[in-house]
């Protein structure tokens, strides 16, 4: 399973940031062309190739003619509470599915995962859940919903005080440091990376299902 996404989808950075309280944010705007927002809340998204799942009928045929059920994860929405010692992030999503054989009512259960990454690669936690979809007789479409949540230690998501001071230090026009972006400082960049978390949601795919998504 590829957990690290090349790009996060479904939830924009603006939405992720606006979900957090103002007390948990570090707003940087010193009037020298530097403006940024650092938040205790994790970024939320769907890793590449894990937002869709396709199942096929018996046998090794993977052509369109043998397709059984296809489903897509969409409408991912996140909220975050960063006022306690444990930062709690919650996300809800919708799964839209379609089947090829519409004869009879049918219930399909699809597994999904939620994982928390720190610094872009370290897996802090992972859990697997299920979403159930019910197709009515004669219908080719069904919809299901899911909800996930994760806790993050507030202390781990907060920047050390010395790093905050480096970032928020007031820079006056004409100062040598005025033209320098504090976020480009290697020490600052490393500290920010350690404090950045992601909560990623996607279908729990088999190796064959993942390979199909990558190559189609």
Regions found by a protein language model. Give the residues of each.
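An exposed acidic His-Trp-rich patch
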Residues: 109-159
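Bacterial N-terminal signal peptides that target proteins for export
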Residues: 1-10
């Amino acid at each position: 399973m590829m957990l690290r996404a090349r790009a996060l989808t479904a939830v924009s950075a603006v939405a992720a940031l606006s979900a957090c309280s103002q007390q948990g944010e570090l707003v940087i705007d010193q009037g020298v062309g530097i403006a940024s927002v650092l938040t205790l809340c994790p970024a939320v998204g769907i890793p590449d190739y894990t937002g869709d799942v396709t199942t096929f009928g018996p046998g090794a045929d993977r052509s369109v003619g043998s397709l059984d059920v296809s489903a897509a994860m969409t409408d991912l929405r996140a909220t975050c509470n960063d006022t306690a010692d444990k930062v709690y992030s919650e996300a809800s999503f919708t799964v839209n599915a379609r089947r090829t054989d519409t004869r009879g009512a049918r219930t399909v259960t699809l597994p999904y995962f939620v994982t928390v990454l720190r610094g872009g690669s370290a897996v802090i936690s992972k859990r697997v859940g299920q979403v159930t979809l019910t197709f009515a007789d004669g219908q080719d479409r069904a919809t299901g919903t899911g909800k996930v949540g994760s806790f993050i230690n507030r202390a781990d998501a907060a920047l050390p005080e010395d790093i905050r001071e480096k970032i928020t230090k007031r820079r006056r026009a004409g100062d040598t440091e005025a033209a320098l972006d504090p976020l480009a400082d290697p020490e600052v960049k490393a500290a920010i990376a350690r404090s950045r978390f992601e909560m990623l949601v996607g279908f729990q795919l088999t190796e064959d299902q993942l390979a199909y998504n990558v190559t189609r």
